[in-house]
Amino acid sequence: MNSKNINNIILRDAKKTNDWLDKYFANKESPSINLINAMKYSVLNGGKRIRASLVLSAARLSGDEKSSLPVAAAIEMVHSYSLIHDDLPAMDNSDLRRGKKSLHVKYNEATAILAGDALQSEAFNILSNNKIIKNTYLQSELVSSLSRAIGHYGMAGGQMLDMEGEKKGFNFEQVKEMIELKTGALISASVVMGSIIGGGSKKIRNSLYKFSKNLGFAFQIADDILDVSSKSNIIGKPTGSDLTREKSNLINLVGLNKASKLANDLIKEAKDELIEFGSNGLELSSLADYIILRKV
């Protein structure tokens, strides 16, 4: 699959996800319209929707895409919540996200915290809603997968390690663990939850989990490379902050060239897990290539 085709798939998946989110929020009622507007500002504020595309692609590979859009939307809500909190002054103190003002700059810190909290809970509301996800057994699996991916043994734990690693000089294994939790856990959840809702067998899920573990690690390395090699007006967020804050990442630990080689090796290992699927695995394989070659 060439780069034009995979770009078209990502754009198509992003449009479907955005349309679903637009419709979901269109008539959303709340005691506070400001909170709803803040939530919409974040989750509908552009973005590549790579995680959504991973959900949808994994569902297609596993057999059935038709019920996967709500899962993709829930993942994007959680991702937006994580970005809101990452940008706060107490975390990464970033005033730019996706080329626009970060939520706490657009509104205020308190509203940003509450909007992030609300987006997280709304994601679980979607997954646990019998009118949206009609298979109660799958509901349980989806909720369990996402809750583990974003809690203390997932994204939140990884963010804590990221903060603890500033100016401490983590070794390779410590950086690897941080990445696997902070970034990799939600990437893995996107793929595995896509397979769950798509009806994938345990064998398929196991292969896709192995694929996603390597993919998540490579994804964060690619992000770190962009942080030192790109410009904020291109990627839509401040660059160079990891170096300024002496963060523990692969670039600071082993240098740009070795980190880039590791990322490419990880992508190859990830794609090897898809060989058994033949042509059905081409879409996820191309997504893996996109992740390592992207410029934003």
Protein language model features and the residues they cover:
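N-terminal amphipathic/basic leader segments beginning at the initiator methionine
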Residues: M1-F25
